[in-house]
């Protein structure tokens, strides 16, 4: 989540979620109008209003046509986004950078949500403070869990095999063979 400060955007997690909810509510209403217009005779097709590509994208997420990937570090943020997804009927495919995903590994597995996670990078800012080396392993090992080793740098992607080896070593350290 971003902090906008003087730029006029939300500066709290609650403000961000309020913005997301408003956007999805707008998309649901937009979708309803567009669907109603599409079911009318050809002469009334324009009653659905002007096409809005931003709302089309969110409507596509609600309809299941678009895979939703969300960037969240903290477990409480992930839980809130899962609640938002349930409220508006969309499915989250994956959380990226979820350094606290281990805290809700079983919920992620139950919801069919994957984690695209770092092997051992956390603590670089407050939102990323509570990570553990076993994060990927614990998310993946939950019944029906899904986690992949992630890198968002050109340098890190060249050594993804080494990042995966770190995950395996961390598993062995806590008694889990991979």
Show which residues each predicted segment covers.
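Polyanionic/metal-chelating signatures
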Residues: 1-94
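Amphipathic coiled-coil/heptad-repeat helices and related helical stalk/stem segments
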Residues: 54, 77, 101, 131-132
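Active-site environment of divalent metal-dependent phosphoester hydrolases
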Residues: 75-79, 98-105, 155-157
């Amino acid at each position: 989540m971003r902090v906008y400060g003087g730029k006029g955007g939300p500066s709290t997690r609650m403000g961000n979620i309020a913005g997301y909810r408003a956007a999805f509510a707008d998309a649901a209403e937009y979708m309803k109008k567009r669907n109603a217009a599409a079911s009318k005779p050809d002469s009334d097709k324009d009653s659905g209003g002007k096409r809005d590509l931003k709302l089309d994208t969110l409507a596509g997420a609600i309809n299941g046509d678009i895979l939703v990937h969300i960037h969240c570090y903290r477990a409480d943020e992930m839980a809130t986004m899962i609640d938002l997804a349930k409220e508006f009927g969309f499915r989250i495919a994956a959380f990226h950078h979820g350094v606290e995903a281990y805290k809700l590994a079983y919920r992620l597995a139950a919801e069919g949500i994957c984690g695209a996670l770092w092997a051992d990078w956390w603590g670089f800012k407050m939102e990323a403070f509570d990570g553990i080396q076993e994060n990927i392993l614990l998310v993946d090992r939950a019944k029906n869990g899904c986690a992949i080793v992630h890198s968002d740098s050109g340098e890190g992607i060249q050594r993804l095999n080494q990042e995966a080896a770190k995950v395996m070593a961390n598993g062995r350290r806590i008694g889990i063979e991979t």
